[in-house]
Amino acid sequence: MAHEKLWGGRFSEPTDQFVEEFTASIDFDKRLYHQDIRGSIAHARMLGKQGILPMAEVEKIVAGLQEVLARIEAGKFDFSVALEDIHMNIEARLTEKIGEAGKRLHTGRSRNDQVALDIRLYLRDEIVEISAYLDMLVDSLIYQAEANLGVIMPGYTHLQTAQPILFSHHMMAYVEMFTRDKGRMEDCLRRMNVLPLGAGALAGTTFPIDREHVAELLDFPGVTRNSLDSVSDRDFALEFMGASSILMMHLSRFSEELILWSTSEFKFVELTDSFCTGSSIMPQKKNPDVPELVRGKTGRVYGNLMALLTVMKALPLAYNKDMQEDKEPLFDTIDTVKGSLKIFADMVREMRINAGNMRAAAAKGFSTATDVADYLVRQGMPFRDAHEVVGKTVAYCIANGKDLPDLTMDEWQGFSDKIGEDIFDAITLEASVNARVATGGTALERVKAEIERAKVGR
């Protein structure tokens, strides 16, 4: 069905069909329908309150918008490319239903401030949902940390065995990361949560509107302070996408570790069958597709951020059609982050830990060598000298096919006469782990305290 353009008065020729299709955004911005209608209802009520529209017309507008909303949610709304976007589709349908009053709804506003409002409302809701998914993932990490207290694994630097740590300590490291991610989301929400409606196209409006009343109706604590900035600003979307990129980086690092840990070479964890797939040719395969996909999707989120940064980097104030390109990368980022968090929260809770393999790996690679150096320092030796002594001890062990616990007392004292029988107690895995009692350390009591602190902070 052909639709007359709601802005067509200045034009004498119809829009080229390909131009119409090329410039339309309805295929992707239709997901903003609920926010668009909610914003329009608040705007209409304000127009009535201010005497700009008669209350009888306001009630017709509100009832009509609610009917449009019900029709969309029932899947009975025909979106039209000819009407370009969600705003015009809804307004045109409203006017068809209620007549002249529908044409008055747009009094005192522009699509420029209207879309700025819609995106903020939408993203505000999505950030709340993403924060809930972050809470679910943190809960799963805490669950694994509590369920596996005392399990010792190797800690790595450069992916080489470094020092023994608690598996629970490793899980709590990710609790810290995802807690920071939630904080970044909350910071983004705080800066974003102001009402742009009322800025008009760019300069404000000549009508005696009450922006603060609209803000109250839409649960915004305040309004934007400059009309040009209100319609030009996409910082809030960029900030969200930046925070999402960091969040996905954390998920990607975790994914890489789970992929490694689930290999036959590590065998530290087993992902349950419901989160893995098989091979079309190799019947023995159990592939960690979920963490692999999350790792891959991280680049997609980075790309979305770069895409929007590039769109915005040279735009003069105020609105430009380029800014229509904000929605697809934003929506894709939202969908990717939500999906990744939801599946990760479930997968982490259900994964199985192989404590025996973790402990066996922690006992290899001279993981307690630093403890020998610390032992010598406590006997009065300068740390650099202790480092040299232990380095030579490790070299001797490698040459002779031994590990540190295999050395005899005579061999130990051949490297330093400061070493006594108590060295053997100092280099057990438990002694190494539990010696690290400073705040942030991997000692069992310290990790228990951090788990409780994280639970209280939920």
Swiss-Prot record:
Pathway assignment: Amino-acid biosynthesis; L-arginine biosynthesis; L-arginine from L-ornithine and carbamoyl phosphate: step 3/3
One GO cellular component, as annotated: cytosol
Record key words, sorted: Amino-acid biosynthesis, Arginine biosynthesis, Cytoplasm, Lyase
Annotated family: Belongs to the lyase 1 family. Argininosuccinate lyase subfamily.
EC number: 4.3.2.1
SUPFAM superfamilies, per the entry: L-aspartase-like
Catalytic activity field: 2-(N(omega)-L-arginino)succinate = fumarate + L-arginine
One GO MF term attached to the UniProt entry: argininosuccinate lyase activity
NCBIfam families the UniProt entry points to: argH (TIGR00838)
Compartments reported by the entry: Cytoplasm
GO terms classed as biological process: arginine biosynthetic process via ornithine; L-arginine biosynthetic process
Name listed for the protein in its UniProt record: Argininosuccinate lyase
Source organism: Geobacter sulfurreducens (strain ATCC 51573 / DSM 12127 / PCA)
Gene name of the record: argH
PANTHER family the UniProt entry points to: ARGININOSUCCINATE LYASE
InterPro entries: Arg_succ_lyase_C (IPR029419), Argininosuccinate_lyase (IPR009049), Fumarase/histidase_N (IPR024083), Fumarate_lyase_CS (IPR020557), Fumarate_lyase_fam (IPR000362), Fumarate_lyase_N (IPR022761), L-Aspartase-like (IPR008948)
